[in-house]
Design a protein with these regions (language model features):
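His/Asp/Glu-rich metal-coordinating catalytic cores
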Residues: 1-116
Length: 118
């Protein structure tokens, strides 16, 4: 499988067929996440597909790059895309998390922090 895999850096124009070009951009979501910008024909139609994106810079990642010259079609898959999905303030979440961990440790408890693999 690795012999059939190629890496494409962000910003590189890649011909995937005679009339379709692909440019990947940072999605800011997780390491290696990308938006896919397809130029179809001679730029007559531009299609962008992405999964989750993040506009705010994090401690690890830059924010998503959405500087496209032109887009006619946009398709976004998202975990938190509904109106009621309000993300809490990062500092508030971190403070609550640290306080909870410190409270458990102060009482002699153990803290297990499971991290899902993506």
């Amino acid at each position: 499988m690795m012999r059939q895999t190629i890496t494409i850096p962000y910003g590189a124009v890649t011909d995937i067929s005679p009339d379709i070009k692909l440019v990947l951009s940072n999605a800011g979501h997780i390491l290696g996440s990308a938006t896919c910008h397809f130029h179809i024909g001679n730029g007559e139609h531009n299609f962008v597909y992405t999964g989750d994106i993040k506009y705010g810079k994090s401690m690890l990642l830059e924010s998503a790059n959405t500087n496209y010259p032109r887009v006619e079609t946009l398709l976004i898959e998202s975990t938190y895309g509904a109106k009621e999905d309000i993300q809490p303030d990062r500092q508030e979440v971190e403070s609550t998390f640290v306080a909870s961990v410190n409270s458990v440790l102060k009482e002699g408890g153990k803290v297990l922090i499971p991290i899902p693999a993506v």
